[in-house]
Curated annotation (Swiss-Prot):
PROSITE patterns hit by this protein: L_LDH
GO biological process: lactate metabolic process; pyruvate metabolic process
Lineage, broadest ranks: Eukaryota, Metazoa, Chordata, Craniata, Vertebrata
Taxonomic source organism: Gallus gallus (Chicken)
Positions of the catalytic residues: 193
Residues involved in substrate binding: 106, 138, 169, 248
EC code: 1.1.1.27
Subunit record text: Homotetramer.
Name of one Pfam family that matches: Ldh_1_N
Full protein name: L-lactate dehydrogenase A chain
């Protein structure tokens, strides 16, 4: 008899059941690992799987997380180069791909990352045909479209992390100006995750009090308080962090875990995330952009119809045109 047999009397032989709340993260770079640790700290999964092509780094990251098991409540953390390890995932988060260099626009990454997606997405679909796909790799709006096209999934199950982070950055900066916690500062950034994102000034409020009603010049060039700068800071923030530390990781990791929580717990919270927007706001092409979406365990179930000012609507259309111009040239 082994020590284990001396210690433990077996009552019931457990069949190897699948995990019920499995999350897989594809790509164990700085962003993938920030997503992983944020998800682990929120106890969202009963199994977390990591996938990457660099096997030593992958195994090292897995071991490093496993060594923290005592402090976590996710009983199984595994990894592998082969996508069979991702089988039966509820949620698959894709962070893999080339990342922005200093001064490089997100749109510049596109063809490199499309080629990577041509390998990743079919493998994910093969092993988890019923999963929700959450795309984080940049340019996120275009790659969410690419993932939707390659996967053959219905639109509601292919989600881009989109402007969830841009809106969080906006609310943080707004809070800094007003001396109020970002949770109590309400404001939405929609459109492209990146340089052509659109701040919806008409909806910015604290406790339901419209800031634009109190300060009509808000967000315009005539504004003495230069609130437009807040949006400029949001657009510049990734570039600034990349310039200073080489990459961004923590904020996007927390933002993705926020979305994962809404999905895994079926919270039906509204998030500014990337979805198919054809037919909305005068957009005629098959593009994915961030709009306020109701998110839950089946993916995106509804879109909130924003009331936009004509100039805001115009900016969203321009965003869509920019993306379509790139999308229609893509080879996949």
């Amino acid at each position: 008899m082994s020590l284990k047999d001396h210690l433990i009397h077996n009552v019931h032989k457990e069949e190897h059941a699948h995990a019920h709340n499995k999350i897989s993260v594809v790509g164990v770079g700085a962003v993938g690992m920030a997503c992983a640790i944020s998800i682990l700290m929120k106890d969202l999964a009963d199994e977390l799987t990591l996938v990457d092509v660099v096997e030593d780094k992958l195994k090292g990251e897995m071991l490093d997380l496993q060594h923290g098991s005592l402090f976590l409540k996710t009983p199984k953390i595994i990894s592998g180069k082969d996508y069979s390890v991702t089988a039966h995932s509820k949620l698959v988060i894709v962070t893999a791909g080339a990342r922005q260099q200093e001064g490089e626009s997100r749109l510049n990454l596109v063809q490199r990352n499309v080629n990577i997606f041509k390998f990743i997405i079919p493998n994910v679909v093969k092993y988890s045909p019923d999963c929700k796909l959450l795309i984080v790799s940049n340019p996120v709006d275009i790659l969410t479209y690419v993932a939707w096209k390659i996967s053959g999934f219905p639109k509601h199950r292919v989600i881009g992390s989109g402007c969830n982070l841009d809106s969080a950055r906006f609310r943080h900066l707004m809070g800094e100006r007003l001396g109020i916690h970002p949770l109590s500062c309400h404001g939405w950034i929609v459109g492209e995750h990146g340089d052509s994102s659109v701040p919806v000034w008409s909806g910015v409020n604290v406790a339901g009090v419209s800031l634009k009603a109190l300060h009509p010049d808000m967000g315009t060039d005539a504004d003495k308080e230069h609130w437009k700068e807040v949006h400029k800071q949001v657009v510049d923030s990734a570039y600034e962090v990349i310039k200073l530390k080489g990459y961004t990781s923590w904020a996007i990791g927390l933002s993705v875990a926020d979305l994962a929580e809404t999905i895994m717990k079926n919270l039906r919270r509204v998030h500014p995330i990337s979805t198919a927007v054809k037919g909305m706001h005068g957009i005629k092409d098959d593009v994915f952009l961030s709009v306020p979406c109701v998110l839950g365990s089946s993916g995106i179930t509804d879109v909130v119809k924003m009331i936009l000012k004509p100039d805001e609507e115009e900016k969203i259309k321009k965003s869509a045109d920019t993306l379509w111009g790139i999308q229609k040239e893509l080879q996949f």
